C-alpha cells in the first residue's frame, strides 16, 4: 500500500547523485535523474532537482506494475538509451549500491549488462577522469580491501554510502526545481517495444507478501565469565551450544572433529 506514504529518494542513490554532481562541476556536462514508479514519485525527483540536478524524468506506466529487478533493469535501460538519443549519450550512469527495500543490488549491474556498459560496483572514490583518453580510475571496496580499477567510458558506477557529503542545494536550485517540469514517459515514450519484458509479465519473481519478522522465541543467554580463563569460557560456550544442538555435536564427533 503506497497510499498516504510519502515517497523519498533511495538514500544510497543520494550519494550517487552527489557524485554525479561533483563530476559535472569538475568536468562539465549535465546530470539527468531518472526513476521508475507511480506518479507520486515526481516529488522525489523534484527533491533531486533542489540538490542541483539539471533534468528529471519519471518513467511511469501501468505496464511497469509488479516489476522485479529483471523487468526494472530492462525498462530503465531502455529509458537510458532513449535519454541518450534525446539529450546525448551519457558517459557515466550512476546508481546507488542497492535500494533499501529490495536490497538485491541487481538493478545497476542489470542496466549495465543490457546497455553493454563497463560496470564498476561498490565504488568509494572516483580518483580521476581523463576526458581526452576517455578513461577513469576509481577505488572500489572489496572483501579483501580496496581495489584500484581503471576503466573506459561509457560506464556504469554503483556508489557506496558515505563516499561524499550530500549538498543541500542553493536557493536558486530550490526556485528552479519548483518551476521545473518533471518529464513523464510511458513505455511508448521510452521506446520500449517488448512489453512482455515489463511488469509482472516480465518478472520471473513475484513478491507474495511483505512482512516484518516477529521476535525470536529463543532468548539470549548471558554467560558468567568472571574469574574464568578464555579456554574455560570457550569450553562453556561449546557445551552450551551442544546442549541446544545435540545433532551438531553428534555430527562433529562422528567425523572426528572433536
Model-based region annotation:
Residues 2-15, 226-228:
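Short, glycine-rich nucleotide/cofactor-binding loops
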Residues 13-24:
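Histidine-anchored nucleotide/phosphate-binding helix
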Residues 28-32, 55:
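Residues at the starts of beta-strands that form the adenosine-phosphate
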Residues 42-79:
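A glycine-rich helix N-cap at a beta->alpha junction
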Residues 54, 91, 154:
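Conserved acidic residues
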Residues 80-90:
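Glycine-rich phosphate-binding loop signature in dinucleotide/nucleotide-binding domains
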Residues 102-117:
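Short Gly/Thr/Asp-enriched flexible loops that form oxyanion-binding sites at enzyme active sites
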Residues 125-258:
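Electrostatically charged, flexible surface regions
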